[in-house]
Curated annotation (Swiss-Prot):
Keyword Zinc-finger in record: no
Classification lineage: Eukaryota, Metazoa, Chordata, Craniata, Vertebrata
Residue intervals of the Glutamine amidotransferase type-2 domain: 2-183
Record: active site: 2 (nucleophile)
Record keywords: Amino-acid biosynthesis, Asparagine biosynthesis, Glutamine amidotransferase
GO biological process: asparagine biosynthetic process
Name this polypeptide is given: Asparagine synthetase domain-containing protein 1
PANTHER family, A to Z: ASPARAGINE SYNTHETASE DOMAIN-CONTAINING PROTEIN 1
Asparagine synthetase domain location: 277-582
SUPFAM superfamilies for this protein: Adenine nucleotide alpha hydrolases-like, N-terminal nucleophile aminohydrolases (Ntn hydrolases)
Source species, domain of life: Eukaryota
Length: 612
């Protein structure tokens, strides 16, 4: 994980990086920072990088080779490029890029990379800058244009201006990689970018370029598909949109939700094989993400015996439970695993006024008063739904792996702290997104990833701060396996055909809905978000299956949605968590209850406007 930035001024007069942006970048990369300014073809270019050490030896960035090529890399290579355990992927990638003699070589190399990434690469021989994000946009990259100063900026994270109308930051669309020629510029403040799009290559189908959406860009910006016809090969196959006539009628009579009902599906040999294949590909995705970690020195290990290297955003729901069960397979048995469970303080429900009817039994009045007092004593303002399911999930994991130390971290947030940190940090990280949903999820994830909470293993609460640099999240499961309530609504109104169309749109828009924001939020703590459900092999496997094999929304909630994943949970030995219906994080953590109940998720959120 790194914070990377590039400021291109089309004159030799350098435009400095905004101070707040520079500060936010340093939060992402606490281990090493460096700025380099170059004058290139009458342009002034600032390269700024801030490194979080995750792999191999600590490698400062921007990283230059002997010929002047320069790489700013915010990513993890999990496949497609040969790397030894002790090697740093930034060094290996720069070496490979430096050997490229053409645009075709660069595009071919980037097509091979598996894992999340965003990058900026200065190719000195061509006097050009390459930049972009991976196919899903799992790493944040923003851009901002200033035609008056004839400059533009690329950055992992921005800063919200006091006057929201002045903001010009946007997320770089992950529809491909971009090339900017520093020798082909004018002083009138126009910016022309060549696009090398992601395209799925198939021998039996014509290659079609997806439409790139660059909405809201200023008139001075032009993005044109490269004239050479070069493209990056999509790392995943298109979704199987076939409509299967097969149904699971043999299980429809078992309308009650129980683990035994789920086990009945596994009596089908083909279904059981499909579930095993999903477990295998998902387990490998988790393995890649929990084993590529920098080694701690001996002194640090001895002082932090109970500190985990891996943390999981954990609600006790099926997505996070499966990640925890699979992480248990690949983390050494003597290493703890942190389970990050966030709750926002609930207000105690007010008791309705007592009826003053004549002749009411005084004994009953006393009994009611005693019961009310007892209820108030029992009330815990942080016993939100995700806390309750989280504790139940913790018990399942202890039963599954009793020798593992599971650190269930109860992260409790008051409204006062929420208001304070939203203004100080979170509004800048969510930016340029600005909806009520972005606010709710951004705040919930920020506090969860910070990892400051308590562990209630003993009689007394123990303050605990998670130091895990890797944070696993369950993003991608709902989008691929029909986990959202809107999927059930679409199925109800439009049948399986409508559901197939809805899911086909989901992954295409996930980068603009979630991933860049969540990367900025988690990265602010000097930690790295990793998304096993969006591993290229996992997505390709699921895309290859008919939708009817992944979900059956004719079955009840808690069974039909994400059916294949629920069967995997049963196969892994999990219990009632396999039957939990989807509960959105903003509702499960109860952050949504703290705000205006009349707001819609898509409304612009006034709370994200900074007043500091």
């Amino acid at each position: 994980m790194c914070g990377i930035c590039c400021v291109v001024s089309l004159t030799t007069q350098h435009n400095p990086l905004e101070e707040n942006v520079h500060k936010n970048l340093k939060h992402r990369g606490p281990n090493c920072s460096k700025d380099i300014t170059e004058e290139i073809s009458n342009c002034s270019v600032l390269f700024s990088a801030h490194v979080l050490h995750m792999r191999g030896c600590l490698t400062p960035q921007p990283l230059q080779d002997d010929t002047g090529n320069m790489l700013l890399w915010n990513g993890e290579v999990f496949g497609g490029l040969k790397l030894e355990q002790e090697e740093n992927d930034t060094e290996v990638l720069l070496h490979q890029l430096s050997m490229a003699t053409s645009a075709s070589d660069i595009v071919c190399l980037l097509s091979q990379l598996e894992g999340p990434w965003a990058f900026i690469y200065y190719q000195k021989s061509e006097r050009c800058i390459w930049f972009g994000r991976d196919f899903f946009g799992r790493r944040s990259l923003l851009w901002k244009f200033n035609p008056e100063r004839a400059s533009f900026t690329l950055a992992s994270v921005a800063s919200q201006p006091a006057d929201d109308s002045q903001s010009q930051w946007q997320e770089v669309p992950p529809g491909g990689v971009y090339r900017f020629d520093l020798t082909d510029t004018s002083l009138d403040g126009t910016f022309i970018f060549e696009l090398y799009p992601w395209i799925f290559h198939s021998d039996d189908k014509p290659i079609e370029s997806p439409e790139l959406k660059c909405e809201g860009l200023p008139r001075c910006v032009s993005v044109n598909t490269n004239s050479s016809g070069l493209y990056l090969t999509s790392p995943v196959c298109p979704m199987n949109t076939s409509i299967s006539s097969l149904t699971t009628e043999q299980n429809h009579n078992a309308s009650q939700t129980s683990v035994e009902n789920l086990k009945a599906f596994l009596t089908n040999t083909d279904k059981k094989a499909m579930v095993s294949a999903l477990i295998d590909v998902l387990s490998e995705a988790v393995r890649k993400r929990v084993q590529y970690l920098p080694a701690r020195d001996a002194l640090e290990v001895s002082l932090n015996q109970t500190k985990a290297d891996i943390a999981i955003l954990f609600s006790g729901g099926i997505d996070s439970m499966i990640l925890a069960a699979l992480t248990d397979r690949h983390v050494p048995a003597d290493k703890p695993i942190d389970l990050l469970n966030v709750a926002f303080k609930m207000q105690e429900a007010k008791m309705p006024p007592k009826s003053m009817k004549k002749g009411k039994n005084k004994k009953n009045d006393c009994d009611d008063a005693d019961k009310t007092q007892l209820d108030q004593q029992k009330f815990n303002p942080f016993n939100v739904p995700d806390r309750i399911t989280g504790r139940a999930g913790l018990q399942e994991l202890k039963n599954l792996s009793p020798k593992r130390q599971w650190n269930f971290i109860e992260i409790n947030v008051t409204q006062e702290e929420l208001v304070e940190m939203r203004q100080k940090r979170i509004c800048h990280l969510v930016h340029p997104l600005d909806t009520v949903l972005d606010d709710s999820l951004g705040c919930a994830i920020w506090f969860a990833a910070r990892g400051i909470g308590v562990i209630n293993e003993a009689v007394d609460e123990e303050l605990y701060i998670s130091e895990a640099k890797v944070v696993l999240t369950g993003i991608g499961a709902d989008e691929q396996l029909a986990g959202y309530s809107r999927h059930r609504v679409r199925y109800k109104h439009s049948g399986l055909e409508g559901l197939v169309r809805e899911l086909a749109m989901e992954l295409g828009r996930i980068s603009s809905r979630n991933l860049g924001r969540d990367d900025r939020i988690i990265g602010d703590h000097g930690k790295e978000a990793r998304f096993p459900y969006l591993d290229e092999d996992v997505v390709s496997f699921l895309n290859g299956l008919p939708v009817s094999e992944k979900a059956d929304l004719s079955l009840p909630r808690g069974v039909g949605e994400k059916l294949l994943l629920r069967l995997a949970a049963v196969e892994l030995g999990l219990g009632l968590s396999a039957l939990l219906p989807k509960r959105a994080m903003q509702f499960g953590s109860r952050i949504a209850k703290l705000e205006d109940n009349h707001e819609k998720a898509s409304d612009k959120c006034k709370r994200l406007v900074t007043t500091i």
